[in-house]
Regions:
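Active-site acidic/histidine clusters and adjacent loop/turn architecture
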Residues: 53-119
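Structured segments of extracytoplasmic/periplasmic soluble domains
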Residues: 64-66, 87-101, 130, 152-155, ...
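Mid-length scaffold segments of soluble, non-membrane domains
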Residues: 102-103, 117-151
Length: 227
């Protein structure tokens, strides 16, 4: 009996923050990109010397988010141009506050630099040096000033010779935008526009790119090393 009393006394004397340490506190930070990641970006042609922004201008963001089951994650990673890093951090802090569901936030490195694989996996991502879908000119993702959110719930569609192409094809069930479901971006467009991402691909006529938020091209060129 005496031992039980001592044990109870010890338990009651533990600091009140002990239980709080078991909770997942949100993580939002900006850091330089570690060498092993930049080397991987070069190896997988995610960045090369023809890109409009120098690799030293890019920052690694660590982000917390809620998934579609309401689980809390602290492992989100995204690469953004340094001049927009704080704004993007503010975006994801607000999405976290609203508990907006995000399937995952991983670097394109995890998909060997393949943007299609990233979209199919419903990955929210930002930097990758490439042309716009369909070709013709360099994508705003190449400047680190564009973000794609939940590609399955917010697909890219284009119409060519009366044939509609949906990317990723898993997003075909989300073409009807009047029926707002979890992960669709319409309820959070304001979060992006309030933080400088004035262009949303969901307002375009053809193609329509619901997942896509960006700065203007003039803003991107002004912020980058582009001449």
């Amino acid at each position: 009996m005496f031992k039980k009393i001592i044990l109870m006394s010890l338990l009651m004397s533990l600091p009140s923050h002990a239980s709080a340490n078991t909770k997942k506190d949100p993580i939002f930070s900006i850091s330089a990109i570690p060498n092993h990641i930049t080397e991987d970006m070069v190896q997988k042609n995610i960045w090369n010397e023809k890109c409009p922004v120098g690799i030293k201008r890019l920052k690694l963001l660590n982000l917390s988010y809620y998934d579609f089951e309401g689980n809390h994650h602290q492992d989100g990673k995204m690469i953004i141009i340094d001049a927009m890093a704080e704004k993007v951090l503010a975006v994801f802090k607000e999405l976290h506050k609203r508990k907006f569901p995000i399937a995952k936030i991983k670097l394109i490195n995890d998909y060997n630099g393949d943007d299609e694989l990233s979209m199919i996996d419903n990955n929210t991502s930002a930097f990758i040096c490439r042309e716009v879908t369909g070709g013709g000119r360099i994508s705003l993702h190449s400047y680190g000033v564009a973000i794609d959110v939940n590609p399955v719930q917010n697909p890219y569609i284009s119409i060519n010779n009366l044939v509609t192409k949906v990317s990723p094809k898993e997003g075909a069930n989300y073409i009807n935008r009047t029926n707002i479901r979890a992960g669709m971006v319409e309820p959070v467009v304001d979060v992006f526009t309030n933080n400088g991402f004035s262009i949303w691909g969901g307002t375009w006529n053809d193609p329509v790119d619901w997942m896509h938020f960006q700065l203007t091209r003039a803003e991107a060129e002004n912020l980058s090393d582009y001449k």
